[in-house]
Curated annotation (Swiss-Prot):
GO terms for biological process: DNA replication. InterPro entries: DBP_sf, Viral_ssDBP_head, Viral_ssDNA-bd. Keywords: DNA replication, DNA-binding, Host nucleus. Belongs to the herpesviridae major DNA-binding protein family. This is Major DNA-binding protein. Pfam families: Viral_DNA_bp. Residues 545-584, 1214-1226 have a biased composition (Gly residues).
Amino acid sequence: MSHEELTALAPVGPAAFLYFSRLNAETQEILATLSLCDRSSSVVIAPLLAGLTVEADFGVSVRTPVLCYDGGVLTKVTSFCPFALYFHHTQGIVAFTEDHGDVHRLCEDARQKYALEAYTPEADRVPTDLAALCAAVGCQASETTVHVVVGNGLKEFLFAGQLIPCVEEATTVRLHGGEAVRVPLYPPTLFNSLQLDAEADEVSLDARSAFVEARGLYVPAVSETLFYYVYTSWCQSLRFSEPRVLIEAALRQFVHDSQQSVKLAPHKRYLGYMSQRLSSLEKDHLMLSDAVVCELAFSFASVFFDSAYQPAESMLFSEWPLVTNATDHRDLIRALTELKLHLSTHVAALVFSANSVLYQHRLVYLQSSARHPSAGGTASQETLLKAIQFTNGLSAACEDVYNDARKVLKFQGAPLKDERYGPQHLALVCGTCPQLVSGFVWYLNRVSVYNTGLSGSSTLTNHLVGCAAGLCEACGGTCCHTCYQTAFVRVRTRLPVVPKQPKKEPCVITVQSRFLNDVDILGSFGRRYNVDAKDGGLDGKGDDGVPGGGAGGGGGRDVSGGPSDGLGGGRGGGGGGDSGGMMGRGGRMLGASVDRTYRLNRILDYCRKMRLIDPVTGEDTFSAHGKSDFVAVFSALNKFVDDEALGFVSEVRLKSSRDEVAGATQAFNLDLNPYAVAFQPLLAYAYFRSVFYVIQNVALITATSYIVDNPLTTNLVSKWMTQHFQSIHGAFSTTSSRKGFLFTKQIKSSKNSDHDRLLDFRLYAQGTYAVVPMEIKLSRLSVPTLIMVRVKNRPIYRAGKGNAGSVFFRRDHVPRRNPAKGCLGFLLYRHHERLFPECGLPCLQFWQKVCSNALPKNVPIGDMGEFNAFVKFLVAVTADYQEHDLLDVAPDCVLSYVESRFHNKFLCYYGFKDYIGSLHGLTTRLTTQNHAQFPHVLGASPRFSSPAEFALHVKGLKTAGVPAPMAATVARESLVRSVFEHRSLVTVPVSVEKYAGINNSKEIYQFGQIGYFSGNGVERSLNVSSMSGQDYRFMRQRYLLATRLADVLIKRSRRENVLFDADLIKNRVMLALDAENLDCDPEVMAVYEILSVREEIPASDDVLFFVDGCEALAASLMDKFAALQEQGVEDFSLENLRRVLDADAQRLTDAAGGEVHDLSALFAPSGVGAASGVGGGGLLLGESVAGNSICFGVPGETGGGCFLVNAGEDEAGGVGGSSGGGGGSGLLPAKRSRL
C-alpha cells in the first residue's frame, strides 16, 4: 500500500466518534495523569493515544462524507484533532487531579479585564440526554464514561451540537485492556440536503433542521471547552477578537471550500496600534499586512489540517517503552509522572521566556528598520519585510483598537495599573480555558525555585505561613499547597517581564525534532551522501521523502543560480556551496566538492581499533594502565587527528575555497506532524500556536508584495481585501513552501470516485436505517500536508565590508589552563585514582598544586621521570589545544575531543583566527530537591503559625521517609546530534528571516535561524554564567532544550541491519585482533572480549564465527580457552588473563630491558615516489610529521605549521584517495543514554 496515495492514507469513514466505556480506577488515574483537567469542569481534555483513548488501529485521516447527491456522496479529506474530550461520568478522572484553587473565577476575571468574548450556551436548546444515549447502545449511564474524538473539519459542527450519532452502526473496540462501544457521528449536511436545490441549505451555527435539532449531539460543556481551548486561542494567534465569528467562518469554509474568499476581515479589530507612532502610510501598510496574514493563516489552517497524515510513533500508547517496561500500575504512574517532570522544562520555557510563542502574536511596525523609503514616499517590499515583525503582545492587550473602517474603538475591559506578569496573564494566553490554566499550574508547582539572594526562600515560607489565615485569593485557604497563587509565589523570580517597547525577537516553539540533521561543528560543509539516482538527493527524497529534506539541507551558495546571502538555503531550501547541491553523472553521490566525512570516518576507525570508544554506542572505553600508557595512546591519537586535519586542508585548498568554508551551515528539522505531540494536550495547544506563527510569518512575504503594488485607497480594509485576496491566496499556495524554511508535500489520489456500501443518509433522516451501495466522490484530488520547518545556524561569523568584526567572536588572547581544566581534563578526573593510586588529593587540587609547584613530597606520584614526562605531555597538549581552540567548549568524552581537535586544527591551519559559534543540546534530567521549596509534598493546605513550625514540619517529612521531590534540570550533550538521533521533543527559539534572491531577482526567500531565549528565568543553564565583561560565550553559543523520546515514548526501530549480541562480540574481537597495542597479545585481548560477556567457555563454532572464519586463528584461541579450563580460571579480567596466558611474553620483554631489534630498514620507502600521502593511507605512527607531502612544518606535538610558497604540485600528490571514501552517514556516533 503506497504511503503517497491519498486513498490509502485516508480511507472513507466517519470523522467523529463517540466512545462509551467503563473505566476502572487504574485507567482513570492514567487519564488524569496525561490529561488536562480542572476541578471546576466536568470535561477532561485527553491526549489522542492509540490503545488508550482510541483503538490500536485508529486511522488519523479519513475521507468523510459531507454532501449527498443523487446516487452518491461527496467526501472531503480531514484529520482528527490531536485530543479527545471526556464529558460524561468523569468524576473518577477529575478526582485524581490536583486542586489549583478557583481557576474558573480566574478565567472569568481575565475575560473581563481583557474584554474577551465569553461562551454562552443556546438558551432555547435542550442538551442531549446522555443517559438515553447510553441506554441506546446498551450501557448503564451511571457506570459509563463517554468521550468524543472529532476531525478538524467537523469540530465546528460538534461545537454547534449538530453532529448526528448513528447508534445502529455501533461497534465494539478495545481501549486499554477493556471493551468500549464506538458510535460514528455524521455532519448535518448529509441529512439537510434533501431538496433538489441542495445548495440552498444553509450551513450555520444557528440554522438547523428539525431532525438535527432532535438528534444532534449537543453538550454545552463540550462546546464551552472547544470555545476556549481551541477557538479563543486561535483568535489570539490571529489577532481576532470574535471567536463565534471565526467558528461560523470555519464551518462554512470546510463545507463550501471558501478558502479563497474573505471571511474575517470585515469583523477584524486592529490591536496594538495606539502605542506606536505611525504615519498614515505606515499604518495602512501595517493594517493591510495584519489583515492579509490573518486571513491567509485562517484559510490555510483549514487546508493543512484537513489533510492526510501518518500517525506518529509517539501516539501509540500501548507500545510506549515506558508502558511495556512498567512492572505494575504504580510503577507506570511513577514513570508517567517523571515524564511530565521532564516536560516541565519545556513548559517553563514557554511561560518564562518573554519571546515565547504564547506571547508572540502582536504585529508591529519597527520604524528604525524602515526609515529609508524609496522615492515618492513609498516603501519597497524588502523595507516592509524588515519593518513589520511579530512581537510580544501582552503590553498591548488593553489598548484601544481600530475597526475595519479605521476608526478608533475604546477598550471595553478593565485594565489594572500593575503590569507585572501575573495569573491573569497566564489565563489570557491560555484562552481562559480552565483545564489549560490548571495544567500550566501543575507544572509551575514542580519547576525549580530560583532564589535571588535578597529574600532567599523566606518569601515562599512567609506565604505558606500566611495561608493559615484562610485569606488566599486563589483558594480561600482550602488548597494553598497547590493553588495557583502559591505557584506564582514560587516562580516569581522566573516570570517574564512585560515589555514596554516592541522589538524584533526570535520565537520560542516546542515541537518534536526529526532524525536527519547537519549539526556537527561545520554542519553540511564537506558532507557527501549516498543517494539513489531516482531520488535526486536532497532535492528528491530526504527526511521521510521530503524534497530538500536530507541531512544536508544546507544553505550558502546555490549552484543553480538561486538566491544567497551566505546563510539561507538555495532554491528548494536545498544546499548551496557548502552542501553542494550536486550529483555525479552516475547519480550516486551528492554533496560537497570535498569530503570531510571521510576524514571523520578514519578517525572513528582509529579510535575503535585502539579501543578508545565502544564501536556501537560511542561510549568511552579507554582504560589507562599507567602514565606512560596514557602518553603513548594520546600522543598517537593526537598525531593521527592532526595528520587528518592537515590532509583535509590540502584537499580543501585543491577543490574548494575559503568562502565555502566560511559559509558552512548547520541545519536541523522540526516535525510539523500534528500527532507528534498528541501525547500531551498542552503541547498540542502550543503546536497550533506554532503553526499559526509559521504560516503568518511566511505569509508576510506574499502580503507585502501585493501591498507595495496595490496601496490602500478605500476606507474599508475589507474592501481592499475583497479585491485582491483571491490573487494573494493563489500566490501564497504556490510560493509558501520550498523557499528554505517551511516544507509541505502534496498527497495525491489517482482516482476521484469509488464505490462502497454506506448508510443511506436520506432514509436515515426519515427514520429508516439502511446500508446501500453508492458512488463516493472526492472533492479534491490532492491535498498539501505539513512536513517540517528547517532551522539553520552559521557557525563562522563573517564581518561585512568595512566591518572589523564582532567583538563577541574576537579571539584576542589565549588563556592558559591547568590540565585538569583543559581538553583532557575529563580523562584526568575519570582515571585519577588509577594514575595516582593512594594520592590522597582530589584531582583538581592535585593539579593545582602541580601547576603551582606546591605538591607536597609525601604525595606518592610514582617514578619521577615518568611523572615529569606525563606532566610535560599534558601541559603541551593542553597549551596546543588552547592555541587552536576556536570552539571554546571543553570536551567531555573522547568523541567530542577528537571531533573538536580535528575541526580546530583544520580551521586554524586554514587561516581562521576568531571564535566560531556552536550549537548545544541541553537534555532534561531529574534531580532531587528540597522539600521546603515544593509545597505540594505537604499533602494538605498549610496551617503553620510561624516559619519555625514550617521548618520543623519539613524536617519531620524527611524523618518520616517522605521521598524528596524531583525537578527537571538540564545537562549539555557531548554531541548535539544525539538530540535528533533520539527523536527528542525540543524547545528552540526560531526567527524567520527573509531575503531577496540574487541577480536582481524579485523572489523572496526565507530561512529559519536559531535564536535566543529572552529572560533570566527560562533555565539557569541559559543565563550568563560569568561576571566577566569579556566573556562572550553566551553570544556565540546557541541552545535548544530537549527531552529524549526514544526508548521512552518511541520504540527504537529494529530494521534489517540490527546487530545481535554475537555480531557485537565479533566486531569487538576483530577490532582487538587489529589493534596496534604492543603491550598485550592481540589473542589475549580477543579472549577477554569473548569472555567479558559470557560466563562459559565458547564452542569452537562460535570462536570460528568471531574470527571471521579463520580456522588457524580459531584453533589458537581454542588452545587458550583450553588452558584456562585446565587451570580452573574463573577471574576473566584483562589483568588476570594477561597473567595466565601472556606470562611468557611478559618475561621475555622484561628480560630484554627495553632493547629491540632495529628493523627500520625493512619498512623504509624504496623511492621518492613511494611517499604516502596523508589523504591516502595516512602516516605511520612513527613517521615525522615534518616529512608529510603537504609541506607543513609541525614542530613537536604542539603542531604549528604554515604553508610553503608554491606548494601546489606537492599538494596534488598529497591527497591521493582522499575523496574515495565518500558516502555513508559518516559522523561519529552519539553517546547513548536513557531518559
